[in-house]
């Protein structure tokens, strides 16, 4: 006789493997796609795969937020920005200041490495143990606006910078 527990675990492992495979496939397609619109659509499909993985890992709130925020807002924003720009793919060469770009990149890596190794990574014990518990949303909200207020504010600055960049790109060459 087949044990239902083993069948459920095997099915869960198979679904996880399928979602991981689909997510990695679309992530690779984002990088290698020649058409920017297809790359944007592949990015949205990759985000759907990540949302499925969140739901499979019993973090339904994060899965729904992934769909609403990243797919519904960011993904569509990226597609609109790509479709509204009138630049041709593979156009003329872009003037790049390579030494300055290398210096900025090196500075960014130094900040990330310093932050990663210089932080004492304590586990947060304030979250409930059951992630499917509805009170988890309240715990996440409290943590965002208490312990993680600085990353939350940095995220708002990054979104503002991307909005300014999108407006700059959508203006067109003649209006700058």
From Swiss-Prot:
Alphabetized Gene3D superfamilies for the sequence: NADH-ubiquinone/plastoquinone oxidoreductase chain 6, subunit NuoJ
pH dependence: Optimum pH is 8.5.
Temperature-dependent activity: Optimum temperature is 39 degrees Celsius.
Compartment list: Cell membrane
Enzyme class: oxidoreductase
Keyword line: Cell membrane, Electron transport, Membrane, Methanogenesis, Methanol utilization, Oxidoreductase, Transmembrane, Transmembrane helix, Transport
BP terms from Gene Ontology: methanogenesis; methanol metabolic process
InterPro entries: Complex_I_subunit_6-like (IPR053607), NADH_UbQ/plastoQ_OxRdtase_su6 (IPR001457), Nuo/plastoQ_OxRdtase_6_NuoJ (IPR042106)
Reactions that this protein is recorded to catalyse: methanophenazine + reduced coenzyme F420-(gamma-L-Glu)(n) = dihydromethanophenazine + oxidized coenzyme F420-(gamma-L-Glu)(n) + H(+)
Enzyme Commission code: 1.5.98.3
MF-aspect GO terms: Methanosarcina-phenazine hydrogenase activity; NADH dehydrogenase (ubiquinone) activity; reduced coenzyme F420 dehydrogenase activity
GO CC annotation: plasma membrane
Superkingdom classification of source: Archaea
Function: Component of the F(420)H(2) dehydrogenase (FPO complex) which is part of the energy-conserving F(420)H(2):heterodisulfide oxidoreductase system. The membrane-bound electron transfer system of the complex plays an important role in the metabolism of methylotrophic methanogens when the organisms grow on methanol or methylamines. Catalyzes the oxidation of methanophenazine to dihydromethanophenazine. It shuttles electrons from F(420)H(2), via FAD and iron-sulfur (Fe-S) centers, to methanophenazine (an electron carrier in the membrane).
Quaternary structure (record): The FPO complex is composed of at least 13 different subunits. FpoA, FpoH, FpoJ, FpoK, FpoL, FpoM and FpoN proteins constitute the membrane sector of the complex.
Family from the record: Belongs to the complex I subunit 6 family.
Descriptive protein name: F(420)H(2) dehydrogenase subunit J
Lineage: Archaea, Methanobacteriati, Methanobacteriota, Stenosarchaea group, Methanomicrobia
């Amino acid at each position: 006789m087949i044990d239902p527990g083993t069948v459920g675990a095997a099915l869960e492992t198979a679904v996880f493997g399928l979602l991981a495979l689909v997510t990695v496939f679309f992530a690779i397609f984002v990088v290698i796609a020649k058409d920017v619109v297809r790359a944007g659509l592949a990015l949205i499909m990759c985000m759907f795969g990540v949302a499925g993985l969140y739901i499979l890992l019993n973090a339904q709130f994060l899965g729904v937020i992934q769909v609403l925020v990243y797919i519904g807002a960011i993904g569509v924003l990226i597609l609109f920005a790509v479709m509204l720009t009138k630049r041709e793919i593979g156009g003329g060469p872009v003037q790049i200041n390579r030494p300055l770009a290398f210096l900025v990149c090196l500075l960014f890596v130094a900040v990330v490495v310093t932050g990663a190794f210089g932080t004492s990574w304590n586990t947060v014990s304030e979250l409930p143990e059951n992630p499917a518990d509805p009170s988890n949303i309240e715990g996440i909200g409290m943590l965002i606006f208490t312990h993680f207020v600085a990353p939350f504010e940095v995220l708002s600055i990054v979104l503002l910078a991307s909005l300014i960049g999108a407006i700059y790109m959508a203006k067109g060459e003649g209006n700058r």
